[in-house]
């Protein structure tokens, strides 16, 4: 590994100007240059978690900075020191943006040459495969049905309708079916889309007089995987076109897999004929996992990250987060990040305070909240406490008020004072807005959690 490299040094300088100091010091500075060949920049990170975090949150930012320095396209790969030192055969953590770019180019090629069946039209998450799905009593039937459909599509269970609450594994099973089919038959045309994408494609095709393109995209596939079908609610024209698409595929013997947060009969304003179609195959529901399954999920996640979690910590996390798998895995990720950055051991005693789902996890000062929020959103502290109604500022201010309410003992009027003398009703409204968005907007939920993590790390360092 090379100690220094002029290109990476320049990229770091550019990133330091564009990122907040905590973000740069925590994530970018520890990354070490490895090599730069044929437009591929390889960086070494302290551990697998840091590689994964950089890939998810900073790969595109690093690539853009590198492209600005080099003057041509750059892709970034992250390797952990453990994998490098152990000559591990684990695949490199490749930029998600690179994967997305490849998917976009494949989809474009598919649209331009629909007769070339070796060019796939799917857009599947590489992690959502059967071997990574932990089967429990809550999901055994859905898993068995998904595997049966993957092995023999268009036969017994057509359509396969998978239903269950948020974050229980519906999307994972759907995409696992797609991966399985592509692995068995590389020429299979597999398409995974959300209902919102289906509706958006339909609207665009109408505007551009391109219904033939739309029909070709959706009716020429061998396997259609459509997520969040509950969003068909009240969309009459979209329901009409989906009904026609469904019939065309079904009559051609093609497999249809549908996912929803509820059974067909419970989706409001859904046409009876669609309810009938959705119910004619198999409806398989997924329930929240029991504690044994949750512990197995955490242990599998730890194995994938090559970590050895104490059993009492696994049991603690599994007992604390019971509503869905996404929340459970998020808790694991936060715990690993916290231990990695602070250097504290992975024990219940050190991890428990920052895993409280209803609080910041530590007591913080108003100044800490304002600094972390302003740094995170790249606004000044003065703007944050001002009366500015610019959207970026007002959104940051609402999140700041929410975090201050959770992390301090201040009353609503006192929080208002910290934000430039705002009325307590303004603070109450801001908190309510953030609470609503936490359950409906993944981006806001991610932003809030990242700032919580930064506050926890900052407070621990000052202990």
From Swiss-Prot:
Subcellular location: Cytoplasm
The keyword DNA damage is annotated on this UniProt entry: no
GO terms (BP aspect): DNA replication initiation; regulation of DNA replication
Binding residue positions for ATP: 167, 169-171
Pfam families (UniProt xref): Bac_DnaA, Bac_DnaA_C, DnaA_N
Region (Domain I, interacts with DnaA modulators) location: 1-79
Disordered: annotated segments: 87-118
Signal peptide: none
InterPro entries linked: AAA+_ATPase, Chromosome_initiator_DnaA, Chromosome_initiator_DnaA-like, Chromosome_initiator_DnaA_CS, DnaA_C, DnaA_dom, DnaA_N_dom, DnaA_N_sf
Stretches the record annotates as Domain II: 79-122
SMART domains, A to Z: AAA, Bac_DnaA_C
GO molecular function: ATP binding; ATP hydrolysis activity; DNA replication origin binding; lipid binding
Chain residue ranges for the region called Domain IV, binds dsDNA: 340-463
PANTHER family per record: CHROMOSOMAL REPLICATION INITIATOR PROTEIN DNAA (PTHR30050:SF2)
Subunit text: Oligomerizes as a right-handed, spiral filament on DNA at oriC.
Function comment: Plays an essential role in the initiation and regulation of chromosomal replication. ATP-DnaA binds to the origin of replication (oriC) to initiate formation of the DNA replication initiation complex once per cell cycle. Binds the DnaA box (a 9 base pair repeat at the origin) and separates the double-stranded (ds)DNA. Forms a right-handed helical filament on oriC DNA; dsDNA binds to the exterior of the filament while single-stranded (ss)DNA is stabiized in the filament's interior.
Domain notes: Domain I is involved in oligomerization and binding regulators, domain II is flexibile and of varying length in different bacteria, domain III forms the AAA+ region, while domain IV binds dsDNA.
Descriptive protein name: Chromosomal replication initiator protein DnaA
Source organism of this protein record: Prochlorococcus marinus (strain MIT 9515)
């Amino acid at each position: 590994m090379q100690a220094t490299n002029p290109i990476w040094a320049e990229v770091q300088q550019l990133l330091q100007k564009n990122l907040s100091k905590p973000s740069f010091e925590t994530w970018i500075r520890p990354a070490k240059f490895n090599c730069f060949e044929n437009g591929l920049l390889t960086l070494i990170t302290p551990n697998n978690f840091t590689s994964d975090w950089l890939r998810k949150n900073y790969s595109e930012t690093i690539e853009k900075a590198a492209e600005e320095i080099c003057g041509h396209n750059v892709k970034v790969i992250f390797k952990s020191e453990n994998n490098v030192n152990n000559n591990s055969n684990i695949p490199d953590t490749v930029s998600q943006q690179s994967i997305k770019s490849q998917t976009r180019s494949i989809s474009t090629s598919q649209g331009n040459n629909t007769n070339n069946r070796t060019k796939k039209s799917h857009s599947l998450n590489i992690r959502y495969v059967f071997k990574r799905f932990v089967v429990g009593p809550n999901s055994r039937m859905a898993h068995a049905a998904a595997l049966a459909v993957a092995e023999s599509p268009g036969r017994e269970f057509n359509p396969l309708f998978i239903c269950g609450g948020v974050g229980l594994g519906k999307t994972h099973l759907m995409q696992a079916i797609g991966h399985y089919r592509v692995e068995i038959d590389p020429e299979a045309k597999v398409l995974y889309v959300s209902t919102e994408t289906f509706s958006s494609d339909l609207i665009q095709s109408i505007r551009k007089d391109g219904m033939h393109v739309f029909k070709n995209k959706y009716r020429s596939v061998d396997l259609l995987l459509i997520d969040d079908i509950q969003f068909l609610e009240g969309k009459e024209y979209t329901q009409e076109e989906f009904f026609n698409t469904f019939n065309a595929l079904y009559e051609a013997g093609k497999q249809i897999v549908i996912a929803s947060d509820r059974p067909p009969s419970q989706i409001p304003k859904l046409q009876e004929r669609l309810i009938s179609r959705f119910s004619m195959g198999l409806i398989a529901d997924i329930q929240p996992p029991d504690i044994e399954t949750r512990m197995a999920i955490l242990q599998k996640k730890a194995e994938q990250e090559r970590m050895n979690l104490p059993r009492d910590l696994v049991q603690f996390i599994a007992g604390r987060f019971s509503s869905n798998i996404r929340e459970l895995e998020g808790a694991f990720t936060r715990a690993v990040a916290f231990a990695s950055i602070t250097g504290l051991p992975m024990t219940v005693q050190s991890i428990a305070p920052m895993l409280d789902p209803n609080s910041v996890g530590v007591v913080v000062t108003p100044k800490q909240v304002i600094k972390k929020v302003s740094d995170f959103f790249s606004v000044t502290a003065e703007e944050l406490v001002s009366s500015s109604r610019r959207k970026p500022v007002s959104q940051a201010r609402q999140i700041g008020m929410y975090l201050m309410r959770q992390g301090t003992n201040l009353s609503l009027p006192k929080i208002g004072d910290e934000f430039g003398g705002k009325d307590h009703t303004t603070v109450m409204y801001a908190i309510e807005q953030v609470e609503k968005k936490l359950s409906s907007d993944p981006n806001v939920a991610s932003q809030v959690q990242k700032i919580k993590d930064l506050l926890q790390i900052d407070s621990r360092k000052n202990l």
